[in-house]
Amino acid sequence: MRKHSDCMNFCAVDATKGICRLSKQMINLDDAACPEIKVMPKCKNCKNFVEANDEGIGKCVGLEKEDWVYSTLNAITCEGHVFNE
Protein backbone atom coordinates (compact mmCIF):
# COMPACT_ATOMS: atom_id res chain seq x y z
CA MET A 1 0.00 0.00 0.00
CA ARG A 2 1.35 3.39 -0.98
CA LYS A 3 0.99 6.14 1.61
CA HIS A 4 0.65 9.90 1.35
CA SER A 5 4.29 10.14 2.44
CA ASP A 6 5.23 8.25 -0.77
CA CYS A 7 3.84 11.07 -2.94
CA MET A 8 5.65 14.08 -4.39
CA ASN A 9 2.52 16.14 -3.62
CA PHE A 10 2.85 15.53 0.13
CA CYS A 11 4.34 18.39 2.15
CA ALA A 12 5.21 17.39 5.73
CA VAL A 13 4.09 19.73 8.50
CA ASP A 14 5.27 17.60 11.43
CA ALA A 15 6.08 13.97 12.22
CA THR A 16 2.53 12.67 11.64
CA LYS A 17 0.75 14.92 9.16
CA GLY A 18 1.15 17.18 6.19
CA ILE A 19 -0.63 19.04 3.42
CA CYS A 20 -1.58 17.66 0.03
CA ARG A 21 -0.35 20.12 -2.58
CA LEU A 22 -3.25 19.15 -4.87
CA SER A 23 -6.23 19.27 -2.50
CA LYS A 24 -4.68 21.70 0.02
CA GLN A 25 -6.09 19.45 2.78
CA MET A 26 -4.34 18.32 5.98
CA ILE A 27 -3.62 14.58 5.75
CA ASN A 28 -1.99 11.90 7.88
CA LEU A 29 1.26 10.72 6.36
CA ASP A 30 0.48 7.01 6.96
CA ASP A 31 -2.98 7.03 5.33
CA ALA A 32 -3.44 5.38 1.94
CA ALA A 33 -2.47 7.57 -1.00
CA CYS A 34 -5.10 8.85 -3.40
CA PRO A 35 -5.30 7.83 -7.09
CA GLU A 36 -3.45 11.03 -8.05
CA ILE A 37 -0.21 9.82 -6.44
CA LYS A 38 3.02 10.96 -8.04
CA VAL A 39 5.49 8.43 -6.64
CA MET A 40 8.44 9.96 -4.80
CA PRO A 41 11.85 8.38 -5.42
CA LYS A 42 12.75 6.40 -2.30
CA CYS A 43 15.16 3.57 -1.72
CA LYS A 44 12.28 1.08 -1.39
CA ASN A 45 11.18 1.70 -5.00
CA CYS A 46 14.70 1.56 -6.48
CA LYS A 47 16.09 -1.44 -8.34
CA ASN A 48 19.44 -0.85 -6.61
CA PHE A 49 17.93 -1.43 -3.13
CA VAL A 50 18.52 -5.10 -2.27
CA GLU A 51 18.55 -7.55 0.64
CA ALA A 52 15.99 -5.66 2.75
CA ASN A 53 15.19 -7.17 6.13
CA ASP A 54 11.86 -7.14 8.01
CA GLU A 55 12.66 -3.71 9.45
CA GLY A 56 13.15 -2.13 6.01
CA ILE A 57 16.93 -1.92 6.18
CA GLY A 58 18.69 -3.03 3.03
CA LYS A 59 21.73 -2.39 0.90
CA CYS A 60 22.19 0.18 -1.87
CA VAL A 61 24.25 -1.22 -4.74
CA GLY A 62 23.68 1.65 -7.17
CA LEU A 63 26.45 3.99 -6.08
CA GLU A 64 30.23 3.84 -6.11
CA LYS A 65 30.28 2.42 -2.58
CA GLU A 66 27.68 -0.09 -1.34
CA ASP A 67 26.09 0.87 1.97
CA TRP A 68 23.18 0.03 4.27
CA VAL A 69 20.12 2.30 3.96
CA TYR A 70 16.54 2.58 5.20
CA SER A 71 13.85 1.69 2.67
CA THR A 72 11.97 4.92 3.42
CA LEU A 73 14.94 7.19 2.70
CA ASN A 74 14.03 9.90 0.16
CA ALA A 75 16.12 9.53 -3.00
CA ILE A 76 15.16 12.69 -4.87
CA THR A 77 18.78 13.75 -5.33
CA CYS A 78 20.27 10.24 -5.54
CA GLU A 79 22.25 9.76 -8.75
CA GLY A 80 21.86 5.97 -8.50
CA HIS A 81 18.06 5.82 -8.11
CA VAL A 82 16.27 3.85 -10.81
CA PHE A 83 12.57 3.05 -10.33
CA ASN A 84 11.62 -0.63 -10.14
CA GLU A 85 9.65 -1.88 -13.11
UniProtKB/Swiss-Prot annotation:
Binding positions for [4Fe-4S] cluster 2 per the UniProt entry: 43, 46, 60, 78
Cofactor(s) listed in the protein's UniProt record: [4Fe-4S] cluster
GO molecular function terms listed in the Swiss-Prot or TrEMBL record: 4 iron, 4 sulfur cluster binding; 4-hydroxyphenylacetate decarboxylase activity; metal ion binding
Coiled coil start-end: none
pH dependence: Optimum pH is 7.0.
Temperature dependence comment: Has a half-life of 15 minutes at 30 degrees Celsius.
Residues holding [4Fe-4S] cluster 1: 4, 7, 20, 34
InterPro entries linked to this entry: 4HPAD_g_N, HPA_decarboxylase_ss_sf, HpdC_C
Cross-referenced Pfam families: 4HPAD_g_N (PF18671), HPIP_like (PF18524)
Cofactor: how bound: Binds 2 [4Fe-4S] clusters per subunit.
NCBIfam families: glycyl_HPDL_Sma
Family the entry assigns: Belongs to the HPA decarboxylase small subunit family.
Function: Component of the HPA decarboxylase that decarboxylates phenylacetates with a hydroxyl group in the p-position. Active toward 4-hydroxyphenylacetate, 3,4-dihydroxyphenylacetate and to a lesser extent p-hydroxymandelate (2-hydroxy-2-(4-hydroxyphenyl)acetate), forming 4-methylphenol, 4-methylcatechol and 4-hydroxybenzylalcohol, respectively. Is likely involved in the catabolism of aromatic amino acids such as tyrosine fermentation.
Protein name in the entry: 4-hydroxyphenylacetate decarboxylase small subunit
Gene transcribed to yield this protein: hpdC
